[in-house]
Amino acid sequence: MEQNDNGLFIKQERFEVLAILREICKQRTPLKVVNDRQQFQSLLLSVGPDNIVFSGDEADNRVDGECTIVIESHDAKIEFSVGQAEFTDHQGVNACSTRLPKELIYIQRRRQFRVTTPHWREFLCSGEYADGSEYQLRIHDLSAGGVGLRVDGPLPENLQPGFQFKKALLDLGSYGSFKVNMELVVINEDHELDDDDNMVHFSRLSCRFMKLGLAMERKIQSAVFAFELDFNKKKKR
């Protein structure tokens, strides 16, 4: 299963699993460890290529059998299962070590689902209208479920809720290009300050993807997640 209507994704790509867990470790996000005998609060202390280490101060003397680890981060709930954990010492702290999970269940919160693209990133949506005329619109924001398109100036008369973009090409630069069908759901008036602190008004077209295959859903979600990780890293520099 790749996605359902609740924003659930199963992350099985090794680089994604490592990237998510390393970010959780870096942010020191609390986690809960649960098995048949006990449950306790913990922190990820280390994420290696093949194993993870989490604090075990609140654990019993043994952590027997398979465990489920639950992490409630600011933008998602993450769950995964690990095998037998072994007690160890990590920089003077009682800890548990186990193998890197093969997959993560990643439930993205709707309020964080959409990523706004900075103005200096030229992410574009292009294609042809039914009459053969071409269009090229800037992608204002994106998610695994759709995109927000930006229109500066008057709206073309044909762009009304219910309009369908057929075979639209989403160009996300180094994050990939995707050809999709989309439906225009709603049009909102929006504004922002430009580099000279002048107010700029524009129209935002909220579009949803139509009948994406599982493979395409996965590719778009991976691109969104990779862009969000890179953008957050740059903001922290």
UniProtKB/Swiss-Prot annotation:
Top-level lineage group: Bacteria
Gene3D superfamilies with a match to the protein in the record: Electron Transport, Fmn-binding Protein, Chain A (2.30.110.10), predicted glycosyltransferase like domains (2.40.10.220)
Source species of the chain: Serratia proteamaculans (strain 568)
Keyword Hydrolase: no
Name this polypeptide is given: Flagellar brake protein YcgR
InterPro entries assigned to the protein according to its UniProt record, in alphabetical order: PilZ_domain (IPR009875), Split_barrel_FMN-bd (IPR012349), T3SS_YcgR (IPR023787), T3SS_YcgR_PilZN (IPR009926)
Stated family: Belongs to the YcgR family.
UniProt KW Nucleotide-binding keyword: yes
Function, in words: Acts as a flagellar brake, regulating swimming and swarming in a bis-(3'-5') cyclic diguanylic acid (c-di-GMP)-dependent manner. Binds 1 c-di-GMP dimer per subunit. Increasing levels of c-di-GMP lead to decreased motility.
GO BP: bacterial-type flagellum-dependent cell motility; regulation of bacterial-type flagellum-dependent cell motility by regulation of motor speed
Subcellular location: Bacterial flagellum basal body
Keywords: Bacterial flagellum, c-di-GMP, Nucleotide-binding
Subunit and interaction comment: Monomer. Interacts with the flagellar basal bodies.
Domain PilZ, chain residue ranges per copy: 108-225
HAMAP family: YcgR
This protein's GO CC annotations: bacterial-type flagellum basal body
GO molecular function, one term: cyclic-di-GMP binding
